[in-house]
Amino acid sequence: MSTGPMPAGNEPQAAVPAAPFGQPVPGSVPVAAPVAAAGTAAMAALPTPSGGIPMPMTVAPQIPGVPVLPAQARPGISADPEWFRTAVFYEALLRSFADSDGDGIGDLRGLISRLDYLAWLGVDCVWIPPFYPSPIRDGGYDISDYTAIDPRYGTMEDFRELVHQAHQRGIRIVIDMVVNHTSDAHPWFQASRSDPEGPYGDFYVWADDDSGYDDARIIFVDTEESNWAYDVERGQFYWHRFFSHQPDLNYRNPAVIEAIHDVIRFWARTGVDGFRLDAIPYLTESEGTNCENLPGTHEIIAGIREMLDREFPGTITLAEANQWPDDVVEYFGTEEAPECTMCFHFPVMPRIFYALRQGSAEAIRWVLEKTPDIPAHGQWGTFLRNHDELTLEMVTDAERDQMYAWYAPEERMRANIGIRRRLAPLLDASRSEVELAYALLLSLPGSPCLYYGDEIGMGENIWLEDRDAVRTPMQWDDSPNMGFSTVVDPGALTLPLIQAPGYAHLTVATEMGRPDSLLHFTRRILHLRRSHPVLGRGGFLLRPTSDDAVLAHTRCDDPSAPEGESLLCVANLSATPRSVTIEVPELAGRRTIDLFGGCPFPSIDEHGRLTLTLGARGYYWLSVDRDTPESVENAEGTEHSGDSQSSAPPADTTSTHTAQNRPTERMPDAHRFHLRSQGSTERGVDRAPAAQRPGPVDLAQRHRDPGGPGPVDASAPLVPAQRRRRPGAGLLAHHRLLGTRGGRARPRHSRTAGRQRAR
């Protein structure tokens, strides 16, 4: 660990020029020594602990003469303090996203080079998991230095440039702050174990035996047998809620609280817009409890929020608390004593997947009804997948067994109490199911977070250890290493690329060139959500339906709002078409317009009922009594509502990927998931000519069907997929490319038969 000055930490740096989409930022990234480790104001005056580990106080880097601006007053960023309500978050795993210097490891400048792509996609905020120095025994969540950047990822100048370049594009930056534990390689722990009476001796939870807190559950049941681990050097046990190499900090020690405050101050001075507070339910311990969500923990989080509001106003905090909503809601705090700005809603996620296989909306409806109201200052965070396993901790034993049978029939698909698979393979590469999942994610209460690669339908490598199965390199194009890195030796890559038949088609470049791809669908639905802020700010109310397979809810602005809007969102979780009547009595007599197709739908009758027919896995977003309908295609070019200077496509894609300039190629048989017609059969029959297709107001049969030969009409509205999949045909995981071979449907087979494994 370096004890010297931070390299060039306070020197003005030349701005990195914005690179066109898909091109690396000019200049190489020098590998610098890590900056000095963080101390604290309280610790700085204390003597150096025995063992020769000096820990000087460091100061966050700043450009001389340029003050740190409040989060709501930064160039390129809107001044709206409520920006997070309508934002789309995107988790970019740094080491697997983009490599700028050819060493096989993703880095900060690689992320900078892809900011134009993220702005084009419709991302408002990038969440970056840990990039600090670490032994990388838990994906970087085992931190050995809180105030440095792992030299494999770049330098502090690179990070500051990332924040600047992101803000110039209207994109905010949220970083992970692991406040519960450190790595056992952290100097604090090394000092604590070697000098129990020294200034760091009480930084962790030590005991003479392992009998304490025996009501606390073990989180990583696959690898850990106890929450205590014995340290030979100190001759005592230390407490850890996660891996044994991640000792928990002792928040009963005021110096620990001040040290963590200083770490957060350090990064807030770089201009980041928020912090995801990792694993916060476990900060304190108490005998006779399960050591989760204790009052002392809430005091600690409230203290962090108070410090940020006072010193860095507008900076948000996002709680990662894998708990039931009744417990999580406490992390919002109160209006008088706020805690977190946002909290992830964990239980709704597995129930979306459960509902898709059960063919009923009851599981989703149940968890939403169990979700308590939250304070006015708060907002839920929602997601379908992330860098961890799809947790099944908050489903019943019977539901868990059923989900394992549906989604993880092979043992190696599982991790801890969950499933280590990506979105598209989970859903058997069904375009209609993936679309429906996104339609639910983007219309339910909360701000959605996408996981890198899910927008193109990336697969997983279940042969990798633990959760690395879903952390493989981003697939940008069909060049060597999928455009992720220029390194010659594939063994130098941070993780192996997915190797499966047809995998080269699952790239940003391929899907960018096809207007009917999953990537373009994702972009359009994100921009549609952006053009209707009610989906982020509006009230939410479940609506009674005549069919349990159909979920209906409204998102409504305050009726007194001069430009308020009301949306009715309807989703059919069944694999068969359904006709349903929805009750919305206060909207009786109002007209409805389909936001995806831009066409009028039936008006709600005088009794407040609306009857619709939905195709299999079909969905609608209906604007109620709006004068000017907007289609997805119009929404795609929507301005960034003040948070972006332009939403135009990146320079290298504007002239080559329009329907007018590019004839539609016949899609490869091996890749019909992304490119096949939504109205085609499993035999891969191309679409009928436009004149033979049903009209846009045919509610049961409407399709956009651009998979066959001939030009694609880019002005045609994008319509949700409603094709009924024939049972038993082509049910292979996504990275093995569902589809047809030689124009013939595959025979019926079990869900596990003939699996091609990524190696």
Sequence positions of predicted segments:
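Active-site and adjacent substrate-binding regions of carbohydrate-active enzymes
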Residues: 2-13, 18-29, 33-645, 660
